[in-house]
Design a protein with these regions (language model features):
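Gly/Ser/Thr-rich phosphate-binding loop
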Residues: 268-272, 284-377, 392, 399-401
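Conserved pre-ATP/AMP-binding loop-to-beta segment of ANL
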Residues: 32, 161-180, 186-187, 197, ...
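Conserved ATP-binding/catalytic segment of the ANL
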Residues: 20, 380-394, 398-406, 410-470
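N-lobe entry segment of adenylate-forming
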Residues: 1-47, 51-66, 70, 94, ...
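Conserved AMP-binding/adenylation subdomain of ANL enzymes
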Residues: 199-217, 227-269, 284-289
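AMP-binding/adenylate-forming catalytic core of the ANL superfamily
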Residues: 264, 271, 415, 420-421, ...
Length: 573
């Protein structure tokens, strides 16, 4: 199949529309669209925005033929396909609430996914669920006790009759979709996002954050069930009339270099990934791959979704400098589903800007003080930019009082993109309506108005009044040549015992013992604390739907195993 390489053919508008429906209506007047690629980087399907609009309007009438009413939820298994996109926009035209849900993304996850899906469906109470054929058996198994739920494959959905009704356009305060959080610290919650809220974020992203241009072309492997994939690379291109190229997330995981090859092949200019995406490419690349790449076209290389390692990005930049990658294109950012997506972006063409602070002062006093001659060790944090226009960032203490710059505290946000609350949680909805602010659950500090994120509140390791960041301990493990980035996870137990779990591929017992002793010694030397090193088989570390390490789940599993071992010991006593 040949690629028409859709071009921008309309006067560019930066998401200045009242609803997602209005955004697609305008994009459909031009010739831009979406292209879907397989794992070999071969074009599978093209979907022009004018075609998407026609299919979405027809799909809306099909959904209404099921006697669904305005505000009903429609769960969508969010695979990277035109079927998902068409169903999502069909919900918008029908006045229904789309609920993108994750697909299984790893070895042996299908059984646990079915149980998780049951929980998500119980949470959002959808009237219908639409899925690709691959996931239909799992969906049927998860929904067999709910005979009133309409379970549809994409083919069955397209075969429904169209209701003979006039579509009622949504208004800005209508709910557009529920975005389930990744669940890094608790069971995922459904974030309520209205058309007004998402359009405010899309405008801020496109006009003030990334600063999109008419000639830009987006490339993404990010999943549509994650806010970076859904808002950043499905809704943003539509709202700015830009074309976008997609790889399936699972294909990227198997062949990460296909991401860079697609950027090079189609002269992509804007692409964003979590840090592990860059690390995977740098680890897997070889000389043959490099010979196929020219990354001079890449204008914005965004980074977000997890703590950002400057060293990791430096290694990527050094590796791909020979194929014209410019490290100034790096654009660290901060965001979360509760703000639709983005809160802040670093300055354009500034690259990765870091702030080094005295680690001891940080851990004992909670202040990000510049190192001096007396400094024993430093911690490094990445500049994630200033708040987007009309949005606010405050750092507050435990009492909710704003603190001075360089003081670490709770990152709190406000602005027109802030969610209406969590679905089914009236208290959260009332609190946001009353205050207009949200405590994100993240910790960080401001310096000259720029945000530096230090970690999650619930992940913080507190030992004898000292605050230790788990990523600092994990970083020590990841410096070992046999341990990859993301293969280590650190947490503290209820007994105040620090645990460092490592996915280890080393089979030699002597080498495993050496690794344990070396890491324990380094952690003792660096932090003055004792850590228990636990070597695990590959694929053992739990992750959220967005690929982040789920420290709370790892801790839960460890405590469960610990309790079981105590029970056995007591039984044998």
């Amino acid at each position: 199949m040949s690629n028409k390489i859709f071009t921008h053919s309309l006067p560019m508008r930066y998401a200045d529309f009242p609803t997602l429906v209005d955004a697609l209506d305008y994009a459909a007047l031009g010739s831009a669209g979406m292209s879907f690629y397989d794992r070999r980087c071969q074009l599978e399907e093209e979907l022009e925005y004018q075609t998407l609009k026609a299919r979405a309007e027809a799909g809306a009438k099909r959904l209404l033929s099921l006697n669904l009413k305005k505000g009903d939820r429609v769960a969508l298994i969010a695979e990277t396909s035109s079927g998902f996109v068409e169903a999502f926009f069909a919900c918008q035209y029908a006045g229904l609430v789309a609920v993108p849900l994750a697909i299984p993304m790893g070895v042996g996850q299908r059984d646990s996914w079915s149980a998780k899906l049951q929980g998500l469906l119980a949470s959002c109470q959808p009237a219908a669920i639409i899925t690709g054929d691959e996931w239909l058996p799992l969906v049927n198994a998860a929904t067999h006790n709910n005979p009133e739920l309409h379970v549809l494959s994409h083919a069955w959905f397209k075969a429904l009759p169209e209701a003979d009704v006039a579509l009622q356009r949504p208004v800005p305060n209508d709910i557009a979709y529920l975005q389930y959080t990744s669940g890094s610290t608790r069971f995922p919650r459904g974030v309520i996002i209205t058309h007004r809220e998402v359009m405010a974020n899309l405008r801020a992203i496109s006009h003030d954050g990334i600063k999109l241009r008419p000639g830009d072309r987006c490339v993404s492997w990010l999943p549509f069930y994650h806010d970076m994939g859904l808002v950043g690379f499905l809704l943003t291109p539509v709202a700015t009339q830009l074309s976008v190229d997609y790889l399936r997330t699972q294909d990227f995981a198997m062949r990460p270099l296909q991401w860079l090859k697609l950027i090079s092949k189609n002269r992509g200019t804007v692409s964003v990934a979590p840090p592990f995406g860059y690390e995977l490419c740098q680890r897997r690349v070889n000389e043959k791959d490099l010979a196929e790449l020219d990354l001079s076209c890449w204008r914005v290389a965004g980074i977000g979704a997890e703590p950002i390692s400057a060293e990791q990005l430096h290694q990527f930049a050094e590796c791909f400098r020979q194929v014209n990658f410019d490290d100034k294109t790096f654009m660290p950012c901060y965001g979360l589903a509760e703000n639709a997506l983005a809160v802040s972006f670093s300055d354009e063409a500034s690259g990765v800007v870091v702030n080094e602070v005295d680690r001891d002062i940080l851990e004992y006093q909670g202040k990000a003080v510049a190192p001096d001659a007396e400094t024993r060790a430093v911690s490094t944090f990445v500049n994630c930019g200033k708040a987007l226009p009309e949005h606010g960032i405050e750092i507050r203490n435990e009492a909710g009082i704003p603190v001075a710059e360089r003081v670490v505290g709770h990152i709190c946000i406000s602005g027109p993109s802030l969610m209406s609350g969590y679905f089914g949680d009236q208290i959260s909805q009332d609190e946001i309506a009353a205050t207009g602010w949200l405590d994100t659950g993240d910790l960080g500090y401001l310096l000259d108005g720029y945000l530096y994120v230090t970690g999650r509140i619930k992940d913080l390791i507190i030992i004898r009044g000292r605050n230790i960041w788990p990523q600092d301990i994990e970083y020590i493990a990841e410096q070992e040549p046999e341990i990859h980035s993301g293969d280590a996870i650190a947490f503290v137990t209820a007994q105040e015992k620090i645990i460092l779990q490592i996915q280890c591929r080393i089979s030699d017992e002597e080498r495993r013992g050496q690794l344990i002793h070396a890491l324990a010694a380094r952690i003792q030397s660096e932090f003055g604390v004792t850590a228990a090193i636990d070597l695990l088989p590959p694929h053992s570390i739990p992750r959220t739907s967005s690929g982040k390490p789920a420290r709370a789940e790892a801790k839960k599993r460890y405590q469960k195993a610990y309790a079981a071992s105590l029970h056995v010991q007591e039984s044998l006593a």
